[in-house]
Amino acid sequence: MSMDNLVRLVEKDQYKQLPDFRPGDTVKVHVKIVEGGKERIQIFEGIVIKIRGSGLGKTFTVRKIASGGIGVERTFPYHSPVVQKIEIVKKAVTRRAKLYYIRDIRGKIRLKERKE
C-alpha cells in the first residue's frame, strides 16, 4: 500500500457531513468546550466571511458583533471534532469570496437574501 493510499484511508474516517454554506451566510456553529472535567456546547453565531482550503484542511471564519459593538472573529476547521454541528440561519447573495470589507462597516450589515 502506497503512502498516498494510506493517507486517503486515514482521512476518510475524519470527514464530516456538514451543510453547504457560502461567505455571507449567517450560521450558528455549535462548538464543544472542555472546562476541567466537564464538556459543554457553546453556540457562536455570525456571518461567514471566508472559506479557505479543501479536504481535511478546509477552514472557515465567522464574524459576529459582541456586546459593546466589538467585532469577534473565529476560525474553525471544517472537519474538526470540536465542531458539533452547523446550522444555517440565513443565506445571502455576495459577489466576493472573501468578505473582509465587512470588518470596516459599522452598524448592521445588510446582505441580500438568497432564494433557492
UniProtKB/Swiss-Prot annotation:
GO terms for biological process: translation. GO terms for molecular function: structural constituent of ribosome. The keyword Transferase does not apply. GO terms for cellular component: cytosolic large ribosomal subunit. The keyword Ribonucleoprotein applies. Keywords: Ribonucleoprotein, Ribosomal protein. InterPro entries: Ribosomal_bL19, Ribosomal_bL19_CS, Ribosomal_bL19_sf, Translation_prot_SH3-like_sf. PROSITE patterns: RIBOSOMAL_L19 (PS01015). Disulfide bonds: none annotated. It comes from the Bacteria. This protein is located at the 30S-50S ribosomal subunit interface and may play a role in the structure and function of the aminoacyl-tRNA binding site. Belongs to the bacterial ribosomal protein bL19 family. HAMAP family: Ribosomal_bL19 (MF_00402). This is Large ribosomal subunit protein bL19. It comes from Pseudothermotoga lettingae (strain ATCC BAA-301 / DSM 14385 / NBRC 107922 / TMO) (Thermotoga lettingae).
